[in-house]
Amino acid sequence: MAVPAVSPQPILAPLTPAAIFLVATIGADGEATVHDALSKISGLVRAIGFRDPTKHLSVVVSIGSDAWDRLFAGPRPTELHPFVELTGPRHTAPATPGDLLFHIRAETMDVCFELAGRILKSMGDAVTVVDEVHGFRFFDNRDLLGFVDGTENPSGPIAIKATTIGDEDRNFAGSCYVHVQKYVHDMASWESLSVTEQERVIGRTKLDDIELDDNAKPANSHVALNVITDDDGTERKIVRHNMPFGEVGKGEYGTYFIGYSRTPTVTEQMLRNMFLGDPAGNTDRVLDFSTAVTGGLFFSPTIDFLDHPPPLPQAATPTLAAGSLSIGSLKGSPR
């Protein structure tokens, strides 16, 4: 049976030179304000983007597991759950607070900044920003470790299949799951390695971005541990839109990992391989130089869902004072 026609969010929009990643929590009794504001974000994007369409402003709005139950009545995404912290023999992938994720992108930072401010203004005291990262494109789409990032991203129909929910969860066809982690790099330790040794850590050549042959690629390299296959040998893909970030005055250099996928299980297996090891104890060597300081799993519904969301759960519906007129009663029956 074919899935209904829907409008996915711009998950597969091309990489841009500028991005802002905002993670926020929803305060007590903030559900109604956030619920209303989410339905107006499309209008904000159109209004700000109209000033200069060549800047290709976009945003992907995503909701965490706990927040979903506070914001929406009715069905919930079948695989949405809180991010599970991973504690390995050497490194930890922490789970950190986050109810809302805004992935804002454009050719220039000015419109990203304007949209971020407008979104937060629309939600006011109902939300608290717990993490804000301003990403930028580095030379040749490289991360701050000096390697090209996103080489193995799928494109075209393969990317759509890798990121878009279909018949397996018909209530949310066209939607997507997204993981985020903020990594901070130990540049002094990294730069103490020779280029050849750095290539063994990553599993690719540094200059020309070629994957090392299997006989030269260590089992604990980043590339080796991030190849996930089905039982029949078919490789499972995700779409990464990672961005470098940093503050030179603080000596902070990092990568913001953001991975979109049709099911969270693919990214979760990658993270288990990296932090717990595959086999157990064979952990990703890049973690000796890059420390995860945040971690979250969110759900990116369709534009249709955000523009016309289901009602608030009964427990989160604002209580009207006795004798007051429900404005909703003037709008006809609830959706």
Curated annotation (Swiss-Prot):
Tetramer binds heme in a 1:1 ratio. Addition of hemin to purified protein yields a tetrameric protein. Pfam families: Dyp_perox_C (PF20628), Dyp_perox_N (PF04261). Its cofactor is heme b. Homotetramer, presumably also in the encapsulin nanocompartment. Its EC number is 1.11.1.7. One of its GO terms (cellular component) is encapsulin nanocompartment. The C-terminus (residues 312-335) targets the protein to the encapsulin nanocompartment. Belongs to the DyP-type peroxidase family. SUPFAM superfamilies: Dimeric alpha+beta barrel. It catalyses: 2 a phenolic donor + H2O2 = 2 a phenolic radical donor + 2 H2O. The active site is at residue 149. Disruption phenotype: No change in ability to grow on an exogenous siderophore (mycobactin), suggesting it does not have an iron-chelating function. A double dyp-enc deletion mutant cannot produce encapsulin nanocompartments, cells are highly sensitive to H2O2 at pH 4.5 (mimics growth in the phagolysosome), mutants exhibit significant dysregulation of redox homeostasis, survive less well in C57BL/6 mouse-derived bone marrow cells and are more sensitive to pyrazinamide treatment in infected BALB/C mice. The gene is dyp. Residues 312-335 are annotated as: Targeting peptide. This is Dye-decolorizing peroxidase. Optimum pH is 4.0 or less. One of its GO terms (molecular function) is heme binding. Heme binds at residue 222. It is an enzyme of class 1 (oxidoreductase). InterPro entries: Dimeric_a/b-barrel, Dyp_perox_C, Dyp_perox_N, Dyp_peroxidase. It is found in: Encapsulin nanocompartment. Cargo of a type 1 encapsulin nanocompartment in situ; this cargo protects against oxidative stress at low pH. When expressed in the cytoplasm (absence of the encapsulin shell gene) it is almost as protective as the intact nanocompartment; its encapsulation has a modest yet significant effect on protection against oxidative stress at low pH. A heme-dependent peroxidase, it probably does not have deferrochelatase activity. Converts guaiacol and H2O2 to tetraguaiacol, also acts on 2,2'-azino-bis(3-ethylbenzothiazoline-6-sulfonic acid) (ABTS). Keywords: Encapsulin nanocompartment, Heme, Iron, Metal-binding, Oxidoreductase, Peroxidase, Virulence.
